[in-house]
């Protein structure tokens, strides 16, 4: 089976700074991959290259068998910031891309109804974003991304600004949507528990310059539940990922984290 996303010797330089050094990674169709690593290791840079928002200095990235040369409708992007249009209602935000594409009002309504229901926002369809909590705004952003029917979702720390309980709820909402439609997901996070809970595989990136350090499989069944979070199997994988990330930290960061 051909990978859905392929990073082939991807290099990214900013002036004299090497942000990514020969990144090689394949992500399968329908796979949910999380990417972790120390700050500055190039996680977001890799995602922005996959989104077509940045052009690599070397190498290439393929979606299917086509090189990525810019943004495309087969890739939906969700950032930490909610990026909703404040003057549009929740439904209008979800339907925005469909409207731009010239889809009929009836078809747009059918699609927005489906995805608003999927993320639990049916009762807020006519509300403006200012009336929503942070978690609800991000659910709206997820519904909008899904409504555009991308084959791939690229998510850059989408839950980082949420409180702990809302974050857990959003993880479950996202997994529920993913389990129904099996889009390919590349999810950037600094949260090791989140990385393990969501993923089929956890990609650990090495520090400065960014490159692939190791891939850790998450052999836990779906649907993921609170019981899985509390299981010894989860703890074992979490500890493996945590140690992999911790040992990528620069020595000065490790010392400061111990109060030295």
Swiss-Prot record:
Belongs to the ABC transporter superfamily. PROSITE patterns: ABC_TRANSPORTER_2. Residues 5-228 form the ABC transporter domain. It is found in: Cell inner membrane. It holds the Pfam family ABC_tran. This is Putative ATP-binding protein BruAb2_1123. One of its GO terms (cellular component) is plasma membrane. GO terms for molecular function: ATP binding; ATP hydrolysis activity. It comes from the Bacteria. The complex is composed of two ATP-binding proteins (BruAb2_1123), two transmembrane proteins (BruAb2_1124) and a solute-binding protein (BruAb2_1122). Keywords: ATP-binding, Cell inner membrane, Cell membrane, Membrane, Nucleotide-binding, Translocase, Transport. Probably part of an ABC transporter complex. Probably Responsible for energy coupling to the transport system. InterPro entries: AAA+_ATPase, ABC_transporter-like_ATP-bd, ABC_transporter_ATP-bind, P-loop_NTPase. ATP binds at residues 37-44. Signal peptide: none annotated. It comes from Brucella abortus biovar 1 (strain 9-941). It is a peripheral membrane protein. Its EC number is 7.-.-.-.
């Amino acid at each position: 089976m051909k990978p859905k996303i392929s990073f082939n010797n991807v290099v990214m330089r900013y002036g004299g700074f090497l942000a990514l050094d020969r990144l090689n990674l394949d992500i399968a169709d329908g796979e949910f991959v999380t990417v972790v690593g120390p700050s500055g290791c190039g996680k977001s840079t890799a995602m922005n290259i996959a989104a077509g928002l940045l052009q690599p200095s070397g190498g290439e990235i393929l979606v299917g068998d086509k090189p990525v040369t810019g943004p495309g409708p087969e890739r939906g992007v969700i950032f930490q910031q909610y990026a909703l249009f404040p003057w549009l209602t929740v439904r209008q935000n979800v339907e925005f891309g469909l409207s731009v594409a010239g889809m009929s009002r009836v078809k747009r309504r059918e699609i927005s109804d489906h995805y608003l229901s999927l993320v639990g926002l049916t009762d807020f369809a006519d509300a403006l974003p200012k009336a929503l909590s942070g978690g609800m705004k991000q659910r709206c952003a997820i519904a909008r991304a899904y409504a555009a029917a991308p084959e791939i979702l690229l998510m850059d720390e989408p839950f980082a600004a949420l409180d702990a309980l809302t974050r857990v709820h959003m993880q479950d909402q996202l997994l529920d949507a993913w389990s129904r439609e099996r889009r390919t997901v590349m999810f950037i996070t600094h949260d090791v528990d989140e990385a393990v809970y969501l993923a089929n595989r956890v990609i650990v990136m090495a520090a400065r310059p960014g490159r692939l350090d190791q891939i850790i499989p998450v052999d836990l069944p779906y649907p993921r539940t609170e019981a899985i979070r509390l299981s010894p199997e989860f703890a074992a994988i979490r500890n493996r990922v945590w140690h992999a990330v911790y040992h990528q930290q620069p020595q000065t960061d490790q010392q400061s984290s111990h109060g030295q």
